[in-house]
Amino acid sequence: MKVTQIRQAYLDFFAQKGHQIVPSSPVVPGDDPTLLFTNAGMNQFKDVFLGFDKRSYTRATTAQKCIRAGGKHNDLDNVGYTARHHTFFEMLGNFSFGDYFKKDAIQFAWDLLTQVFELPKDKLLVTVYAEDDEAYAIWKDQIGVPAERIIRIGDNKGARYASDNFWMMGDTGPCGPCTEIFYDHGEHIPGGPPGSPDEDGDRFIEIWNNVFMQFNRDEAGVMHPLPKPSVDTGMGLERIAAVLQHVHSNYEIDLFVNLIKAAKDTVDGAGGENCDAQSPSLKVIADHIRACSFIVVDGVIPGNAGRGYVLRRIARRAIRHGYKLGARKPFFYQLVPALVKEMGDAYPELRAAQDKVSEVLKQEEERFFQTIANGMEILDGALAGGAKVVDGETAFRLHDTFGFPLDLTADVCRERGVTVDSEGFEVAMQKQRDQARAAGKFKVAQGLDYKGVPTRFHGYETLKHEGAKITALYLDGSAVNSVKAGDAAVVVLDNTPFYAESGGQVGDKGELRNEAARFTVDDTFKIQADVFGHQGEVLEGELKVGDTLNALVDIALRNDTMRNHSATHILHKALREVLGDHVQQKGSLVDASKTRFDFTHNAPITAEQIRRIEDIVNAEILDNSATSGKVMSLEDAQKTGAMMLFGEKYGDEVRVLEIGSSKELCGGTHVSRTGDIGSLKIVSEGGVAAGIRRVEAVTGQNALHFLQGLEDKINEAATILKTHPGDLVNRVAQLQESLRLAERELEKVNSKLAASQGDELAGQAIDVNGLKVLAARLDGADAGVLRETMDALKAKLKTAAIVLASVQGDKVSLIAGVTADSIAKVKAGDLVNFVAQQVGGKGGGKPEMAMAGGNDPSKLGAALDGVKDWVASK
C-alpha cells in the first residue's frame, strides 16, 4: 500500500466505526500560546478532553500534520541521520470523548492492523502499564495475544507514574495508562523488546499508542477517576508505511523515495554535478521541504524570533545541505511542486498555496545564499592579519545574527589552517538558550474557578439588560459572597449585554447598578468560553451573590468600537483585493479609538495602494448596505465561502457576518448598516516582523478629528514658510531647489579643498619597496571630503597604499585606498582594519577602497605611524 492509500484506509476504517473524520488542524496552533507547533493529533481536542469545549460528536478520527523542530519536541539535529526522525510527520489518530474505552479501543486497533493492514499477528508485541490489569486482560483474553508477547512496564522514569506507559497532560489534570503496539522486524535486526536493556535497538518499533484518560490528578498527586473516561491514540503514518512497504527506514517509503529523487534533480541542476544519491543530505532536504512548506501554508514567514526563527532554521539547514552537495544557487523552493504532487490531494490547502510557498522559500533561499557571501566577507575580515583562531563570539554572531552555520565557518577555517573557538561558541549559545522561552508543554488554564450556569449574551440586540442575577463574585482571584464600596472585583451575571473581549475586539465598559449599589465595569472578559467576567470597582453600596441589577453598556464607546470592527472586515477584504489573496490576518485590536490590523505581506504598502484601499472601503461605506449575522453549522458556513482565519478555533456552530462585500466568521459586535461607519482613514502603515505588516485606521468622528489635525499642521507650516496653505507644495519645492544649489556650491568648495590637500599630502608619501605609503589626518573632514581627497591622492601617486583619518569629537573616521596595480600585495580592507582595531573599531570594503570607524582618538597617532611597517611586512 502507498502512503496515500494507508492514510485513507485508516480514516475509512474509523468512519465505519462511527467516528467523525475531522480535518487536520493547522501546524500553527491559533488558540494555544503554550505550544510552538502542533505536535500531536490530540492538540486540537485538548479543550474537549479538559471539558472546556463540546463537540457534536463523541468519536473522531484524524490525519494530523505535526511539526517537531522547536521547544521540548525537537528532532531537528537527528533528521537525515536516523531511520525515523522527522521535522514534519503525519499522526493518524482516533479519539473517544467519554464514549468507548479500553475494550473497544484495543479491539479497533487490533482489527485494523491484522485485518485491514494484514500484519502477521506473531509480528506484533504489546506493552501495558504494570498496574493496568484491565488492559492486560483485554489483550490476553479478548484479543488472544500470548502472555509472552504482553509486557508490563512500570514506573521506569524515577517517580510515581513516571512511565513510558503512563501519560500525563501536566503535573495536574487528566492522565492515565497507555498501551503501545510494537512491530518485530525480526531476529536479524539488533535490539531487544521494550523494557529490556537493548530496547533502543531497531528490531522492535512502536507503531501505535493508545492512551486511556481515566484519572484526574490533583495537586497532592491523588488520582481521582474521571466520570467519562476518554481515549487518545496516535500512529505515525511514516512508520506504519515503512512496515507495510517492507522497508526498514521511513526514508525508503514511496513518498520519500519520490521527494529524494526530486531533491537530487534540483541540487544537480544548481551545481551539484551528479551528487551522491545515498547522501543523508538529500534525506534532510526531502524532510525539510515538508516542514517548511506546511509552516508557510499556515501563515508563518521566516524571521528571527518564535516560529519564524524555527522556519528559518529548518530552511537554512536544508539549503546548507544542498550547498554541501555543490548547489551554488537557489534550488530548495523548486521542490514545492514535487511535494504538492505527493500530498496536495490529502491537504488541498497546500495545493492552493503552492505559489505563495514557492515565493516565500525562494526569497529566503536568495537571502541565505547572499548570507553565505556576506559571511565569507566577515570571515575574511576576522582572519585578516594572520589570525589563527576565530573567537567564539564572532562565530556565534555569524551563526545567530547572519544565519551563517557553524559547520560552514569551521569548513572555511579548516581550509585555511585556522581553528574555531568552539568552546566560546558554546558559551554564547548556552547564554542564548538560557534566555529562550520554553515552549511546547501543555498547561491547564489557571483561570477563576467557576462552576455555575453559563452567561447568556444579549449584546447583539440591546445595550441594556434589567434584572441580571449575580451568579459569582471574585475578590483578589478568590470567590466571595459579597463585595463592598471600594473593592476591585469581578462580577459574573446570568445575563449580560456586555461583550467579552475576544476576536481582537476589546471588552465593553459601562455600569451595573440597582437601588442599593453601583459598580463601574472597566473591562469584560471570558472566564470560560460561555462565562463572562465584568471587572471593575464597587462605587456605592454592597453587592451579593444572588442580587439582581441592571447592566448598562457605555453606548458611545460601544458604537465607536462597532464602527471600527465593521470597518476592519471591509478593510481586510480591500487589502486582499489590492495586495493579493496571500494577505492573511495575523492579529487585530479593535477598540473605540482605532482599529489595528496585522497581516501577511512582504513589502511596504505604497501611497497609491493605500489610497486605493481607502477608496474601496469608503465606497462600501457610502453604499450604506445592511449588515447581517447568521448562526449556522461550521460545515454550512464553509459552503457559503465565508473567510476563515488560519489557526482560529471554531466550534460546531459559527456566526457568518456579511458587511458589504465582506463575508467572514465573526462573533463580534457590528453596525447595522455600512453607512454607520461614517468614513475610514488609514493613519499608519509599517512592518512589525519579517513578512508581517500593520495598518492602523480610524473611523467616524475619530477620522474627522485626524483630518482636522492634519489641516492644523498644514496651516502652521504655511505660516512658518510665509505662504498660503494652497501654495505650500510650491514653496517647499522652491526651498529644496535653493538647498540643492547651495549643496552644489559646497561640493565645488570641497573638491577644491580635496585637490589642494591632495597636492600638499602627496609630498608626505614614503616609498616602501616601490609602493608609496601615506597615512595622514584631515580633522573635520566628512566622509565625502575623505573620499574625494583619497581619489585625488591615488590619481597623483599612481602606485600607492593610503590611509586618511578624521576626528570629530570622540569619533574616528577612516578610509583606506590601494591603487589597482597594488591590490595583489595590499588590500584596502586589511589595511583599514589594521588601523581600526587600534582605535576601538572595525570596518571593511573592497580591495581598492574600504572604510571604518573607531571611538578612541587617543591611539590614532600611533596607529597611523604603524602603517608604514605594516605595509613593509606584506
UniProtKB/Swiss-Prot annotation:
PROSITE patterns: AA_TRNA_LIGASE_II_ALA. GO terms for molecular function: alanine-tRNA ligase activity; aminoacyl-tRNA deacylase activity; ATP binding; tRNA binding; zinc ion binding. Keywords: Aminoacyl-tRNA synthetase, ATP-binding, Cytoplasm, Ligase, Metal-binding, Nucleotide-binding, Protein biosynthesis, RNA-binding, tRNA-binding, Zinc. Its cofactor is Zn(2+). The keyword Metal-binding applies. Its EC number is 6.1.1.7. Pfam families: DHHA1 (PF02272), tRNA-synt_2c (PF01411), tRNA_SAD (PF07973). InterPro entries: aa-tRNA-synth_II/BPL/LPL, Ala-tRNA-lgiase_IIc, Ala-tRNA-ligase_IIc_anticod-bd, Ala-tRNA-synth_IIc_core, Ala-tRNA-synth_IIc_N, Ala-tRNA_ligase, Ala_tRNA_ligase_euk/bac, DHHA1_dom. It is found in: Cytoplasm. Catalyzes the attachment of alanine to tRNA(Ala) in a two-step reaction: alanine is first activated by ATP to form Ala-AMP and then transferred to the acceptor end of tRNA(Ala). Also edits incorrectly charged Ser-tRNA(Ala) and Gly-tRNA(Ala) via its editing domain. HAMAP family: Ala_tRNA_synth_B (MF_00036_B). Belongs to the class-II aminoacyl-tRNA synthetase family. NCBIfam families: alaS (TIGR00344). This is Alanine--tRNA ligase. It comes from Polynucleobacter asymbioticus (strain DSM 18221 / CIP 109841 / QLW-P1DMWA-1) (Polynucleobacter necessarius subsp. asymbioticus).
